[in-house]
């Protein structure tokens, strides 16, 4: 009897320990790891709720493309100042099954009635209906889903429909832009109605509901992309743009098609290959920067001492300057022959020639780098990186251009439209440095403007993704993407440090190197000793998101400059 009681007692103790263990383990198992390393799949973007939507899409059996679309639909709500369905995007997609990369071009195009001298002032290209180009976002989602989707199209819209109806707290990024652009918003009745309460713009944490966009999303979920381009939404879209002075027609929407690019730009970095879009984006600029710099064989030792670090950053800035000088020759390859320009910008021989012109002791006047024209800045963007369980990946960047785009927001559909023509060159306007506008970037019907996007996927010789990276932040996108790659690949920084490390930017025109406030003073001093003009950035330079393959899984990092955390499982 005693023996029986002892055994029962021991069993009771074991049972209690098991229950306690489960109580301690289960909550922590449901949490995301503190170091943001995920064993199966990962996502990085600048809106946490949207990442959770993407992650849940993956868990439900969705592909990397499914997750990207579901998350981007959400980002279009939570960061409406940067992107949405009235804009356009590019996607770089890597299929782990086939081992092939591709690019989908769903950027806006000029309406058929557009012409080079259509703007009487630069302000006209920034605000109002005339600044609106034909949106491509939804056609891009459609093509990507047709090629790589697993879940039903309508399923991808459901979480965002619910979010738009129920509302969500205004995030850090949107709140900052609302405050900064308060005067502009006050002048636009529809924006005022959407983003203000009690005569004040919404602040961080206050609830924003978007019922009209919820209805629009529902229509797209049911009818597909056709609803936007020649279905039940089309007539209202045309009416809204034309009522604001625009020239987009039903024919423009009917004829819009996203473009599949089956052979994206690629360059070798050691035993890996980088895939990215070519011109009309800035993939060739990124390629030239990295090709120039890889000849220096950078390593962690390159930034160990103040002297080494100063020289290394000087070389990086000089590579930026040479690359941006050549950027002025890029344009839409359907309208401008950029074959030779892109061939040079991706040539290791050409990069070596430019490297030989870099002096370790001084920078040079602008003319030394031989810029021929200038290209305008681009603005508000959103980037997203995804790696799915099967190892497939998506790097996607969408942009409305300047914050809140054209400021034209439909009172019926809730769609906020782009102002994509601020990134086109205007023939009548020479910039403040005396450089003429680039003819390669003049407006023509059906043409797309040059942008700084560099949505990149790095793949090893084994066919496995090593890194997915991209950025948001206008012209600085290219240099910030380059720095994130340099920091991780050559300096050996982990992905979080690669994304957070202070950055600098130089686009040649103006002749200034912008540095973040917390950058190492040894870097600034070394640059000034070498005759660089430096200035402290008034705000963060750009925002980077990245995912890197590690021994422990997928390490994801979200730039704290804009707030949020990555997601995965």
From Swiss-Prot:
<feature type="binding site">
    <location>
        <begin position="451"/>
        <end position="452"/>
    </location>
    <ligand>
        <name>L-glutamate</name>
    </ligand>
</feature>
<dbReference type="GO" id="GO:0050727">
    <property type="term" value="P:regulation of inflammatory response"/>
</dbReference>
<dbReference type="GO" id="GO:0005886">
    <property type="term" value="C:plasma membrane"/>
</dbReference>
<feature type="binding site">
    <location>
        <position position="399"/>
    </location>
    <ligand>
        <name>L-glutamate</name>
    </ligand>
</feature>
<feature type="binding site">
    <location>
        <position position="420"/>
    </location>
    <ligand>
        <name>L-glutamate</name>
    </ligand>
</feature>
<comment type="similarity">
    <text>Belongs to the gamma-glutamyltransferase family.</text>
</comment>
<dbReference type="GO" id="GO:0006751">
    <property type="term" value="P:glutathione catabolic process"/>
</dbReference>
<dbReference type="InterPro" id="IPR043138">
    <property type="entry name" value="GGT_lsub_C"/>
</dbReference>
<protein>
    <recommendedName>
        <fullName>Inactive glutathione hydrolase 2</fullName>
    </recommendedName>
</protein>
<dbReference type="GO" id="GO:0048471">
    <property type="term" value="C:perinuclear region of cytoplasm"/>
</dbReference>
<dbReference type="GO" id="GO:1901750">
    <property type="term" value="P:leukotriene D4 biosynthetic process"/>
</dbReference>
<dbReference type="InterPro" id="IPR000101">
    <property type="entry name" value="GGT_peptidase"/>
</dbReference>
<feature type="signal peptide">
    <location>
        <begin position="1"/>
        <end position="30"/>
    </location>
</feature>
<dbReference type="InterPro" id="IPR043137">
    <property type="entry name" value="GGT_ssub"/>
</dbReference>
<dbReference type="GO" id="GO:0005783">
    <property type="term" value="C:endoplasmic reticulum"/>
</dbReference>
<dbReference type="GO" id="GO:0031179">
    <property type="term" value="P:peptide modification"/>
</dbReference>
<feature type="active site" description="Nucleophile">
    <location>
        <position position="381"/>
    </location>
</feature>
<feature type="glycosylation site" description="N-linked (GlcNAc...) asparagine">
    <location>
        <position position="511"/>
    </location>
</feature>
<keyword id="KW-0963">Cytoplasm</keyword>
<dbReference type="InterPro" id="IPR029055">
    <property type="entry name" value="Ntn_hydrolases_N"/>
</dbReference>
<dbReference type="Pfam" id="PF01019">
    <property type="entry name" value="G_glu_transpept"/>
</dbReference>
<feature type="binding site">
    <location>
        <position position="107"/>
    </location>
    <ligand>
        <name>L-glutamate</name>
    </ligand>
</feature>
<keyword id="KW-0325">Glycoprotein</keyword>
<feature type="glycosylation site" description="N-linked (GlcNAc...) asparagine">
    <location>
        <position position="230"/>
    </location>
</feature>
<keyword id="KW-0732">Signal</keyword>
<dbReference type="InterPro" id="IPR055262">
    <property type="entry name" value="GGT_CS"/>
</dbReference>
<keyword id="KW-0256">Endoplasmic reticulum</keyword>
<dbReference type="GO" id="GO:0070062">
    <property type="term" value="C:extracellular exosome"/>
</dbReference>
<dbReference type="GO" id="GO:0002682">
    <property type="term" value="P:regulation of immune system process"/>
</dbReference>
């Amino acid at each position: 009897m005693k023996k029986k009681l002892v055994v029962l007692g021991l069993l009771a103790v074991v049972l209690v320990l098991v229950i306690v263990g489960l109580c301690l383990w289960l909550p922590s198992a449901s949490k995301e790891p503190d170091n943001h390393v995920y064993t199966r799949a990962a996502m990085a973007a600048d809106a946490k709720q949207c990442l959770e939507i993407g992650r849940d899409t993956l868990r439900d059996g969705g592909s990397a493309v499914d997750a990207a679309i579901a998350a981007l639909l959400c980002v279009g709500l939570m960061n409406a100042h940067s992107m949405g369905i009235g804009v356009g995007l590019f996607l770089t997609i890597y299929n782990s099954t086939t081992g092939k990369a591709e690019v989908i071009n769903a950027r806006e195009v000029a309406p058929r009635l557009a012409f080079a001298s259509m703007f009487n002032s630069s302000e006209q290209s920034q605000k109002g209906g005339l600044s609106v180009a034909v949106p491509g976002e939804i056609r891009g989602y459609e093509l990507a889903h047709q090629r790589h989707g697993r879940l039903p199209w309508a399923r991808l819209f459901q979480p965002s429909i619910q979010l738009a109806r129920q509302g969500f707290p205004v995030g850090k990024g949107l709140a900052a832009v609302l405050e900064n652009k308060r005067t502009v918003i006050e002048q636009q009745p529809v924006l005022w109605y959407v983003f203000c309460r009690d005569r004040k713009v919404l602040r961080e944490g206050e609830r924003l509901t978007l019922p009209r966009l919820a209805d629009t999303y529902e229509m797209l979920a049911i009818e597909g992309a056709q609803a936007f381009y020649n279905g039940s939404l089309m007539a209202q879209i045309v009416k809204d743009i034309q009522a604001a002075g625009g020239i987009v027609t039903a024919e423009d929407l009917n004829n819009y098609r996203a473009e599949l690019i089956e052979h994206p730009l690629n360059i070798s970095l050691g035993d890996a290959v980088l895939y990215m879009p070519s011109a009309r984006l800035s993939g060739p600029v990124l390629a030239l920067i990295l090709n120039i710099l890889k000849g220096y064989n950078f390593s962690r030792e390159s930034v160990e001492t103040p002297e080494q670090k100063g020289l290394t950053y000087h070389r990086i800035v000089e590579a930026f300057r040479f690359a941006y000088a050549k950027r002025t020759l890029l344009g839409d390859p359907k309208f401008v022959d950029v074959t030779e320009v892109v061939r040079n910008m991706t040539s290791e021989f050409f990069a070596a020639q430019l490297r030989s012109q870099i002096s370790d002791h001084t920078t040079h006047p602008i003319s030394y780098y031989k810029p021929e024209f200038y290209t305008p800045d681009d603005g508000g963007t959103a980037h997203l990186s995804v790696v799915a369980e099967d190892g497939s990946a998506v790097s996607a960047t969408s942009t409305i251009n300047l914050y809140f785009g054209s400021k034209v927001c439909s009172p019926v559909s809730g769609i906020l439209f782009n102002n994509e023509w601020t990134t086109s060159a205007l023939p009548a306007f020479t910039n403040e440095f005396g450089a003429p506008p680039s003819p390669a970037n003049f407006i023509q019907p059906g043409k797309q403007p040059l942008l700084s996007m560099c949505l990149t996927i790095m793949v090893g010789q084994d066919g496995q993704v090593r890194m997915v990276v991209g950025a948001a932040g206008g012209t600085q996108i290219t240099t910030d993407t380059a720095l994130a790659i340099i920091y991780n690949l050559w300096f050996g920084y982990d992905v979080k440090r690669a994304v957070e490390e202070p950055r600098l930017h130089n686009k040649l025109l103006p002749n200034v190197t912008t540095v973040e406030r917390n950058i190492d003073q040894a870097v600034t001093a070394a640059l000034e000793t070498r005759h660089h003009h430096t200035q402290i950035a008034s705000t963060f330079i750009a925002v980077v998101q990245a995912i890197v393959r590690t021994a422990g899984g997928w390490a994801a990092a979200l730039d704290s400059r804009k707030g949020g955390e990555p997601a995965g499982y």
